[in-house]
Amino acid sequence: MNADRQDVSLLMEEIGVAARSASRLLAQAPTKQKDAALLAAAMAVRANIDDILAANAEDVADAVKSGTAPSLIDRMTLDTKRIEAIARALEEIAALPDPVGATMAEWDRPNGLHISRVRVPLGVIGIIYESRPNVTADAGALCLKSGNAAILRGGSDAMRSSQAIHASILEGVIAAGLPEAAIQLVPTSDRGAVGEMLKGLGGNLDVIVPRGGKSLVARVQEEARVPVFAHLEGVCHVYVDGEADLDMARNIVLNAKLRRTGVCGAAETLLVDEACAATHLAPLVAALIAEGCEVRGDEAAQKADPRVKPATEDDWYTEYLDSIIAVRVVKGVKDAISHIAKYGSSHTEAIVTANQVTADRFLAEVDSAIVLHNASTQFADGGEFGMGAEIGIATGKFHARGPVGVEQLTSFKYLVRGSGQVRP
């Protein structure tokens, strides 16, 4: 296909038509065939590891030269361990129950009609993402397992990596006898391709999932003519309650912030109950600084440790994706919930406390997609939820919320079986 700028519209139209055709076949594909494709793809990823690493090295080198932020470079960097994780994710998705055709509910009517509600694929799913080449495999595999065709538009900064991974995925798709257009990677970095996807590809795109920064998600939400599974920024919080164990709180805070700073589930704000500030605040701040984390805090945090920098109003809204955290002392769980409601992004929040009543209140009143008790926010991940992988963390409330796995990539229809009934 000619991918010159003047031909982007035609290119995307052809991709859309091919995807729609493939989606009809995928909707009827047996579970064994879909699983065979995913297992073969996992084998191909492992077999082609040298090619994938070489492609990724070129992408990373270009990113370093262009001054890309370290957090974004971390997201796009692949190594042997991360590539093995991609292969394992493919195998885990293959092992998941097939949602297509599953009966969600069924009942009989007094007139003898038998009604059942069953899961069906959405159709064609477009995924627009930045930096993370592993999304190429995860998103493609989840769409395939759920009987959907996928159109993947990865970021130009990781184009070579995505192409290398996509080539391995296609090996599995073709080996299993499924259509090559089941998982397509847009072969151009022209931004016009995104615009065409947002228009819906002439009715051939059923839903869009944006995976990227605030500006990308905002553009998709503003311009898309098809439904969007919004994956907003992760301004995630950890609230250390007055009845929190200090050692547990320290371990959770360090993991939530620093395990991987560039993931959307990384904690960006630490809230400490004034009831335990005298005993917990200074040790928590010191532990973060000892691990190389910059701390920006309110007056109480600054008094607890002179190394704390003053926090501005903007800090409470910021997704740093870096070794930086904002710290504030709050007046109990009610104040913590209010802070999260004002400054959070409805992504993931955690409470550390030994008080079950307080925990239950936090879990009930915090209006985020994922809320945890005594666990790190970095568990905000489809794989950790047993979904095999995720296509994103949906922070909206329409159709899907939280990790978007195979079930969330389906809709449903009603099957009505009768014996000649007519309506009076």
Swiss-Prot record:
Q: What class of enzyme is it?
A: oxidoreductase
State if NADP is listed as a keyword: yes
According to the UniProt entry, its GO molecular function terms are: glutamate-5-semialdehyde dehydrogenase activity; NADP binding
Q: Name one GO cellular component term.
A: cytoplasm
Pfam families of this UniProt entry?
Aldedh
Question: Which cellular compartments is it found in?
Answer: Cytoplasm
Q: In which pathway does it act?
A: Amino-acid biosynthesis; L-proline biosynthesis; L-glutamate 5-semialdehyde from L-glutamate: step 2/2
Keyword Cytoplasm set for record: yes
**Keywords for the protein's UniProt record, in alphabetical order:** Amino-acid biosynthesis, Cytoplasm, NADP, Oxidoreductase, Proline biosynthesis
According to UniProt, the reaction catalysed is:
L-glutamate 5-semialdehyde + phosphate + NADP(+) = L-glutamyl 5-phosphate + NADPH + H(+)
> Where does the protein principally reside?
cytoplasm
What biological-process terms (Gene Ontology) are attached?
A: L-proline biosynthetic process
Q: What is its EC number?
A: 1.2.1.41
Q: Which family does it belong to?
A: Belongs to the gamma-glutamyl phosphate reductase family.
* Functional summary from the UniProt entry: Catalyzes the NADPH-dependent reduction of L-glutamate 5-phosphate into L-glutamate 5-semialdehyde and phosphate. The product spontaneously undergoes cyclization to form 1-pyrroline-5-carboxylate.
What is the protein named?
Answer: Gamma-glutamyl phosphate reductase
